[in-house]
Regions:
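Active-site-proximal beta-strand elements of phosphoester/diester hydrolases
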Residues: 1-13, 135-149, 184, 249-255
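Active-site neighborhood of phospho(di)ester-bond hydrolases with catalytic His/Asp-centered motifs
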Residues: 5-7, 38-43, 70-77, 142, ...
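Binuclear metal-dependent phosphoesterase catalytic core
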Residues: 132, 240-311
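Conserved beta-sheet core of the metallophosphoesterase superfamily
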Residues: 61, 197-275
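Active-site-proximal segments of metal-dependent phosphoesterases and phosphodiesterases across multiple
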Residues: 147-159, 175-228
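Extended active-site neighborhood of metal-dependent phosphoesterases/phosphodiesterases
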Residues: 55-167, 175, 225, 269
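Active-site environment of divalent metal-dependent phosphoester hydrolases
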Residues: 10-15, 45-50, 74-88, 127, ...
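N-terminal active-site segment of His-dependent metallophosphoesterases
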Residues: 1-58
Length: 311
């Protein structure tokens, strides 16, 4: 089975550098690949804006990806709380987060892409859910933590609450006979370093990097080892790499677009056979692999947001 893994698309059509061109390029490239399933591990949007979700839904539909057997999605912290769009947002972000209904945002994300949540072997509300493909089990585990002034002041920390943790265990026990087990979530499990450059935006990034930790990792490590999970996919930290921690294999797709060199795309390709799971982090030059893009017209529908219409 061939799985393509991408993450952190951060679509934001408020800005000229919206990542829309890169996302269309990625989907065109994927469409030409002989793949079985696509996994996107969170932060599909940058600011949780409704028009960005609508654009992504349309792009997925055009590529026949709005199907549970073709696409699995994870919500990211930016899909719930958004992020820092302008320098002034640094001073108003906390107030914005306090007004957001976490559970409502989970429901809205589900409704935008509800077709991809169908044909599950297990699903309770939104997360966790599981899909079974022959001798492969894919489990989706939500790590986005509700906003808290004390425990999650920048809405970027992660946590898997006890209820969901127990449900994941239930899934792994119910499908214990399945040979290959893959879990995907949004938050990373590795340690990261701070930026040394200056500037207000990078100061914010350094603050955020100190508050993007996945809490209570110890019990997650124990669970992953106990149930012999073969591979854990994630994003959040904008780096594409394969690594091991506590004897567990991880694959990050956080630099699919973000923090990659200009016009460079990174796509994780996973090949699963009876004998092994192989991983290839494919680097693509956007300029030398250009495909056919959808025509895009921009029209203004309000005082703040340009509306992008796909024809």
């Amino acid at each position: 089975m061939k799985i393509i893994h991408i993450s952190d698309l951060h679509l934001n059509t408020y800005f000229k550098n919206s990542h829309l061109e890169e996302i269309k390029f990625i989907l065109n490239f994927i469409a030409k690949e002989n793949f079985d399933h696509l996994i996107i591990s969170g932060d599909l949007t940058d600011n949780a804006d409704s028009q960005d979700f609508e654009i992504l839904r349309d792009l997925f539909k055009r590529k026949d990806l709005l199907r549970g057997d073709r696409l699995s999605l994870m919500i990211g912290n930016h899909d719930v709380y958004g992020g820092i769009v302008t320098p002034n947002d640094i001073f108003t972000f906390h107030e914005k987060c306090e007004k957001i209904n976490y559970h409502l945002r989970l429901n809205e994300f589900y409704l935008y892409f509800f077709e991809t949540f169908e044909n599950c072997a297990y699903r309770n509300d939104y997360y966790p859910y599981a899909k079974k493909f022959g001798d492969l089990l894919i489990v989706a585990m939500n790590s986005v933590m509700p906003y808290s002034k004390v425990r999650n002041p920048f809405a970027s920390n992660g946590s898997v609450n006890l209820e969901q943790y127990n449900e994941v265990i239930k899934i792994l026990e119910e499908f214990s006979s399945v040979k290959r087990k893959l879990i995907f979530t949004h938050h990373h499990f590795n340690k990261i370093k701070s930026l040394r450059t200056g500037g207000l935006y990078n100061v914010w990034n350094n603050i955020e990097k100190q508050t993007i930790k996945l809490k209570k990792k110890k019990r997650l490590f124990n669970m992953l080892r106990k149930y012999n999970v073969d591979l854990v996919l994630h994003g959040h930290y904008h780096k594409s790499e394969e690594y091991y921690r506590k004897g567990i294999r991880f694959l990050n797709a956080g630099a699919t677009i973000k923090d990659s060199p200009r016009k460079t795309i990174r796509i994780n390709i996973i090949e699963i056979s009876k004998e092994k799971i192989s991983v290839d982090i494919k680097k693509l030059d956007l300029n030398s692999h250009r495909g056919v893009y959808y025509p895009v017209n921009k029209t203004i529908t309000g005082p703040e947001y340009p509306r992008i219409i796909l024809q």
